[in-house]
Amino acid sequence: MGLTLTWLSIIILIPLAGLFLKTFELSFDQLWAIITSRRTLHALQVSFGLAFAAALVNLVMGTIIVWALVRYRFPGRRLFDAIVDVPFALPTAVAGVALTSLFAQNGWLGAPLAGLGVKVAFTPVGIFVAMIFIGIPFVVRTVQPVLLDLDVEIEEAAASLGASRWHTVFRVILPSLIPALLTGFALAFARAVGEYGSVIFIAGNLPNVSEIAPLLIVIRLSEFRYADATAIAVVMLVASFLVIFAVNRLQRFAQTRMPAH
């Protein structure tokens, strides 16, 4: 137990404590001016807003992908299952370059979308696409083992009792998946908020337009404004912690409700 706490302190707690201590170099007025500046607020809004939206999309699409992989047998299923892990293994810079090439105005998908008046690369839409790309495996790999362990006989029993397919999904299957879905959502959100490598290539990185908070931190560091960078990092840390804490509370609540179903 003591060794575990020691490693936890060295790896996580001490660096985070150092991050908070760095902000004490600023007065409250200076700290408030940094985190409420137009550029900082917009960067935080872009990062957290798009990360939340991307995590929601991944929650839905990831569940559909898991259902297809677990409940259906089709040619190429194993290959498709392996492809899901590509964002895990792919260097983020490579992912960013690939997405930018694909969605640029002369890219395979960017060209037809541009013809429809939709611009993806170098806009917040591109950030959204990149966050979906890097986040989808977290939902799939979190929910997949739970659905695999779910006994199909329970669904058959519900059907034999006259339950419709949708009633079975929402009253039998979904309640068992909710804790895993919430975990997948939290992981996808956390990854998207902190993503840097794949996003900066497709974002455009224009201040007050498509600049993400991690990039703003790097810019402040390059300007030797370490306290400013630390202040933005602390805001991201606290906000991320609150979101993940809320999701974990919902997860525990869902687990306590599962026996009722």
What would you call each of these model-derived segments?
Residues 1-26, 34-148, 172-197, 201, ...:
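Membrane-water interface segments at the C-terminal ends of transmembrane alpha-helices
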Residues 201-207:
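Juxtamembrane non-transmembrane "cap" segments at the membrane-aqueous interface
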Residues 161-163, 175:
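Glycine/proline-centered hinge or cleavage motifs at structural transition points of membrane proteins
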Residues 211-216:
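Transmembrane alpha-helical segments of integral membrane proteins
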Residues 158:
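The alpha-helix within a helix-turn-helix
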Residues 152, 169:
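Active-site/ligand-binding-proximal alpha/beta "capping" segment
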Residues 154, 250-261:
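Short cytosolic juxtamembrane segments of multi-pass membrane proteins
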